[in-house]
A protein has these predicted regions:
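Glycine-rich phosphate-binding active-site loops on the catalytic face of alpha/beta enzymes
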Residues: 11, 69-71, 92-107, 158-184, ...
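Glycine-rich anion/phosphate-binding loops
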Residues: 74-89, 109-120
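Alpha-helix-loop-beta-strand connector modules within alpha/beta enzyme cores
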Residues: 48, 52-73, 112-134, 141, ...
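Hydrophobic faces of well-ordered beta-strands that scaffold small-molecule active sites
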Residues: 2-14, 44-46, 65-72, 98-100, ...
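Glycine-rich, proline-tolerant flexible connector loops at the mouths of alpha/beta enzymes
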Residues: 33-53, 57, 98-116, 138, ...
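Catalytic cores of alpha/beta
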Residues: 78-92, 142-153, 196-204, 212-228
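Alpha/beta catalytic cores of nucleotide-metabolism and tRNA/nucleoside-modifying enzymes
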Residues: 1-31, 124, 196-204, 212-247
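Conserved N-terminal beta1-alpha1 strand-loop-helix module at the mouth
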Residues: 1-80, 92, 153
Length: 247
């Protein structure tokens, strides 16, 4: 198993979240990009404002590293038009993967048609531009029934509107890694949540993000059936190490 080809090395902190100046935070992001190039990871996952920087570094290095970015991050509450506008800019800047935060609060409040509409329109935009689309459902904000239902909703929109050969380009993704939970509850991928996603999103692939911090945990997720793992400690995982960093 080449675990590096499952890893989306991730740095999504804003400067304020990192306690850094904008310039210093960009330097940190650039270090993640350089590491991902050197380690031959599948993808580097970064904020939209860093995509063009990553594109230049990857092109200059003649690397096959893919670029992913997040759309409407981390709450997913923007309108469909706002999501699309942000995604178009990311595409123009050189993103390969578009990780949209689903409007999970609207889903929880019963606005099912709104969610179906954004999944359809944003997925269409991505696929028309030959991009990989991922839908972040934020499992820590959902109960088990909601995880099952939202995974199935995304699946049903995709299989009802797109050709079968495109299914592998639309993922259901567990988490932003930034959701605030009560106490010490996990805010990312857990084994139970991933199993529910796999069972109800299939044939769409699943990405586990947040909470996977060791080689052992990554292998366990892969054996369950996940196709991608988002983590800020990709090198430590690839080296078979453990880490205590939250995302």
């Amino acid at each position: 198993m080449n675990i590096k080809q499952y890893l989306d090395s991730t740095y999504l902190k804003t400067a304020s979240q990192a306690g850094l100046s904008e310039a210093d935070n960009t330097i940190v992001a650039e270090k993640f990009i350089q590491e991902a190039i050197e380690e031959c990871f599948k993808l580097i996952m970064i904020r939209p404002d860093i995509v063009s920087i990553a594109k230049k570094k990857i092109t200059d290095a003649n690397s096959n590293l893919q670029i992913g970015t997040v759309i409407d991050f981390p709450e997913g509450k923007s309108s469909v038009d706002e999501k699309i506008s942000e995604a178009i800019q990311a595409i123009e800047d050189g993103a390969d993967d578009l990780d949209f935060v689903c409007n999970y609060e609207a889903f929880k409040n019963g606005s099912i048609d709104l969610v179906k509409d954004e999944v359809l329109k944003c997925t269409l935009l991505g696929l028309e531009n030959n991009k990989v689309v991922k839908w972040i459902i934020e499992v820590a904000a959902l109960n088990d029934k909601q995880i099952i239902q939202l995974s199935a909703l995304i699946k049903n929109v995709v299989i009802s509107n797109f050709k079968e050969e495109l299914y592998q380009s639309v993922f259901v993704k567990s988490s932003t890694g930034f959701y605030k939970t009560e106490g010490d509850l996990p805010n990312g991928a857990t084994i139970p949540s991933i199993i529910m996603m796999l069972e109800n999103a299939s044939p769409l692939p699943v990405k586990a993000a947040g909470g996977v911090r060791s080689y052992k945990e990554a292998v366990e997720m892969i054996r369950l059936g996940v196709k991608r793992i988002g983590t800020s400690v990709a090198k430590a995982i690839a080296d078979g190490q453990n880490s205590q960093i939250d995302y």
